[in-house]
A protein has these predicted regions:
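A composition/biophysics-driven feature that prefers long, compositionally simple stretches
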Residues: 1-255
Length: 256
């Protein structure tokens, strides 16, 4: 957290020693999470800021639920929350790019269900919830739904991507360089439309009026949430993909 005259880093006990060493002399204060004397970030902001001031954060890094809770608490002191900009962009010159590692298919022989079958299951769940479509932002849910795996996150076989599922169209938003010709052909045969990773917000902003959009508020970042037109109805709940992937089919059970 950076204010006009203070800066602080909040971290847990795994990094207390490392953070203390690396922050020494930097002017950045270490706040040790889970200790009784440590204020939360929200408490710090409420103490340091005044009515009429604003807090900026990158809406791609906060869930819709987290942003809503923070905005509500800040509003008690008439402090605004602005999630529209990444304030670090342009300052962090050597910032790593979004990973472009190639993805690979989780074959049906191991997953026990095709992509098309999984999309049908999700759409059935959406109908029962009274929703027309679903935003997928949790990487594990996307990997399960589209039978894909990757190496974007160390020790986790997930793929940096977004997805949108509806009866009419299922879209995987992913960097093109991650796709081989074989997996591109496979996904298209399964009824999946491929789109550039960065196009997700523009796509959501053009959803038809009166669409009923299912959103898992804890797993969808606030930038995606804010891109949904005001004419749409938000259906909140736990993602259908999260429920479905927890129910193991016979092939998956045999694989344990």
């Amino acid at each position: 957290v950076v204010t006009a005259d203070k800066a602080g880093l909040w971290t847990d006990s795994r990094y207390f020693l490392q953070a203390a060493s690396q922050l020494e002399g930097s002017g950045i204060e270490l706040y040790k999470l889970a200790l009784p004397e440590t204020p939360s970030i929200t408490e710090f902001l409420l103490h340091e800021l005044h009515a009429g001031q604003a807090v900026g954060l990158d809406g791609q890094t906060y869930s819709a639920a987290e942003a809503s809770a923070l905005a509500n608490k800040l509003s008690r002191k008439e402090i605004k929350l602005d999630t529209s900009a990444d304030l670090i962009e342009g300052i962090w010159k050597d910032r790593p790019a979004v990973p472009g590692n190639p993805i690979f298919e989780m074959p049906e022989a191991l997953s026990g269900a095709s992509v098309h079958e999984k999309l049908d299951l999700i759409n059935n769940q959406l109908r029962s919830e009274g929703a027309d479509c679903l935003i997928l932002a949790a990487l594990d849910e996307i990997a399960w739904t589209f039978n894909i795996r990757g190496t974007d996150v160390t020790y986790n076989p997930v793929v940096v991507s977004y997805a949108f599922v509806s009866e009419d169209e299922s879209v995987l938003f992913i960097k093109p360089e991650k796709l081989t010709a074989e997996i591109t052909e496979h996904l298209k045969k399964e009824g999946v439309t491929l789109a550039e990773y960065s196009m997700i917000q523009r796509y959501l902003s053009r959803l038809p009026e009166n669409s009923r959009v299912f959103v898992d508020m804890n797993k969808t970042n606030v930038s995606l949430y804010d891109a949904i037109p005001g004419s749409c109805t938000i259906v909140e709940g736990i993602s259908p993909a999260n429920h479905l992937k927890s129910i193991k089919n016979e092939t998956e059970i045999k694989g344990f």
